[in-house]
């Protein structure tokens, strides 16, 4: 079935991680670019429905500036740039909005080499505590005709998500260079290159995460979706239009990652994308759904991505850290559990259904349990090592105590001068025993690490 769309938009999310010591300087670099970036101060009256959608503690986590009074904001704005960046680096979530007067258009080639023109209507940087950030590009295909070929949407999503500094080769060559377009990889590189953690740059994906809405034409019957189902899965898994893949209708995994609460709407979830596929015959799908999908549900994706990257980061730190860093790791993991690990985020039943599906798609409960298990094993290792050292120290003191008790007894029956050499040898042995143990343990640790 050849599908046409009446309306569409796609958010492309580029995730990147900044080392904690560089995070304030990254924020400072954005604050200094006053002609390009503006910090978002959330105001309750501007979007009451979206803010009220989330539970109170979620509002404080996602929109902390919502709770800043006018006096504090005025004082904050008068502070120096670096002072502001230090304060913002301790904030749970901050957002910067790009001046779109500088960028509006872009072009990319499809599978057949045809040019797809698109508009960039919004660019944001969203950063969570710990330096986990996202660049969010909101795009729409620039189509002169009333209806958009669905294949064009598939190709656009598939190729645009490759436009990152991490992708090399042919994907980058699909950018069409001219005076009116923007080079997306270069744009990203200018923001992140000096600050992005190189050791973590592939901890998620080389490609951007795709979050896409499409309203299709001529979907009037339930049976129509069956005809469009394979194209929907291509949309969900960000495949290009020429892909010959035919999805297995009996695969349980496919059904686990889709959700339909209302007629003529289908949500799709994966670790690469989030999509909604709706009909223009349903009024809600063309009036409220586009708004809710990006104003409410998009934040769920950001939270899920933030949690997943944080947990993977913890896991990598457990493998890399020196075994003396247990206190710092415990502090960070406890803080994450207390302030950033959410089970309930909204009172909306539909919203909670979507949130649970995102948790499932990203495997968050399993990943959280795995990290805790790794930490407990790590903690047990450190504790057992420390216990061994304490036991060794106690043993040394015990040997010294016994030795000198014996010496004291001998002085009562033997001339003191005769045992001076013995005393010196015993003291030297006792003094050198623990340093010798430390050196031997260090050598053993190095050999174990090497082999």
Q: What is the role of each PLM region?
A:
Residues 189-310, 316-319:
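N-terminal extramembrane/targeting module of integral membrane proteins
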Residues 120-121, 262-263, 433:
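Short beta-strand-initiation
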Residues 293-410:
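Membrane-associated alpha-helical segments
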Residues 1-220:
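N-terminal pre-transmembrane cytosolic regions of membrane proteins
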Residues 3-10, 14-16, 370-451:
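Hydrophobic alpha-helical transmembrane segments and their immediately adjacent juxtamembrane loops
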Residues 1, 111-114, 285, 318-328, ...:
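Generic structural signal for short, solvent-exposed loop/turn connectors between secondary structure elements
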Residues 136, 317, 425-426:
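Secondary-structure boundary/capping motif
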